[in-house]
Amino acid sequence: MMTLLRSFFVLTTFLFLSCNSSNEISKPNIVLFMVDDLGWQDTSVSFWKNETKFNRLYNTPNMEILANMGVKFTNAYATPVCSPSRISLMTGMNAAKHRVTNWTLNPNKKKPAEINHKIFEFPDWNYNGLSTLDSISNTIYATPLPQILKDNGYYTIHAGKAHLGAIGYPSSNPLNIGFDINIAGHAAGAPQSYLGVDNFGNNNSKNKIWAVPGLEKYHGKDIFLTQALSEEVLEKLQKPINSKSPFFLYFSLYNVHAPLMEDNRFVEKYKNIGLKNSEIKYASMVESMDHALGVVLKELENKDVLKNTIVVFMSDNGGLSAVAREGEKHNHNYPLKSGKGSIYEGGIRVPMIVYSPFHKTNIREINHPVIIDDFFPSILEFTKCEESSFVQNIDGQSFVPLLNNETVEKKPLFWHYPNWWGPIGPGIGSYSAVRQGKWKFIYFHDTQIIELYNLEKDISENNNLISVNTSKSQLLANVLTKYLKSVDAQMPYNKITNSIVPWPDEHPLFN
């Protein structure tokens, strides 16, 4: 893998010359490496100004290589839970617009935590997920990203977690949304087991819903799920590589989602430094994830296609912190507050790296805020497919100009979660929020509490400025409300007041 680093500067020089001496270049390959529940500080790559204890704990050498080759995005955001991020990725739409605002699984059902809630009756959101047809109830009708790429000549591979549609609905199978190949993707958002000796959960009839499909040749073997997926990815890549066809690989790992389980290839070092049991499991899963990244990068380099491949690394939400971890809850994403499910930074700010041999810049870090909605137009621009037609109106804005060091207006970023996740903790609940520049405004639906933070000075969100900067608060409340109304965003019904939750700009502080 060190060859990657040694060849990087030679490679970019070669590409600069070749790309400028030809009127037409071949379509770039795209590798989108999506990790599940990986926190902003769960790697040995630091995305903050200071290195933290977590950066020193976890071992992710291949992420380090990718970051040295590419560009770190230090203000990258997803949604607080998984399915909304994945639908935004596939459609370019914000969750408030596509209305898949919570995680999907069972058809025609809200989540258990939403049913018979003591305060709220939650809206009839799109719990059946994505759809390529406009006639299916409680789905978002859209033209998915892989379908557009496939229609433009790309060989499309899905590997790992899908979680795009409820059980029995077409989008639960990635083959129905434009992928040529589906490796182990289905409706569920977590595996029953990561272990081949457990048949990845397929020998547990009680919880069959979580069993990972399609990896039967690894059943009974001493192999971790991530390793099995990596081997399948390498096999499926050979067809487009050998035929010199452009490919889109969406490698969507189940790691590091619970249940926490040891990848025995990586546990010894963490046992030797005295970590407790669940943290040993978690650290081994982080390293397992990184190893999978390295396997793919090495194969691309060995087959001489990395020079024509854009690699994007991202997590689907903030790091797990409310459950399953050792130590005090909600403190595993320091300096960020809280974790998965929360509207605080620990729940939505995620690690992101982009390597593109086609964008010649000396910058190694981009601080411009971006969000998962932006991936759809960015990948279309990367692949010269931005003129393609699609049925949805998108919210995303391409981040490709940032890689060319161009000045881009800092648009507001929006989050909307008119739902209930289940676990209790800071910032976990039903809420809406906006970030504009350095300012972040949060509106909690149940308590009607509003908060304002200057993220440049207070990344940990400890100093609520709502009472000292009412004008900025009102401005952001207006921006948030205008957007929510423009997309006809759903709001919960308050059973105590017998009314729909008011819009943010209707808060008593502003009236």
Model-derived features with residue positions:
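Histidine-centered active-site microenvironments of extracellular/periplasmic hydrolases
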Residues: P170-G178, P259-E262, K298-H359, I371
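Long, internal low-complexity/basic segments
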Residues: N23-P28, V35, W40, K72, ...
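A short aromatic-rich beta-strand->coil structural motif
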Residues: I30, D36, K161, V233, ...
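Active-site segment of extracytoplasmic enzymes that catalyze sulfate/phosphate-ester chemistry
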Residues: L32-F33, W40-T143, I148, N202-N203, ...
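A long, amphipathic alpha-helix that forms part
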Residues: F224, A228-I241, E268-T309, E326
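C-terminal cap/loop subdomain of S1 sulfatases and analogous C-terminal strand-loop tails that border
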Residues: I181, G319-E345, K360-R364, H368, ...
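A short beta-strand-to-alpha-helix junction
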Residues: F54-T60, T74-V81, P107, A113, ...
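Formylglycine-dependent
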Residues: L105-Y155, A162-S245, L253-E262, A283
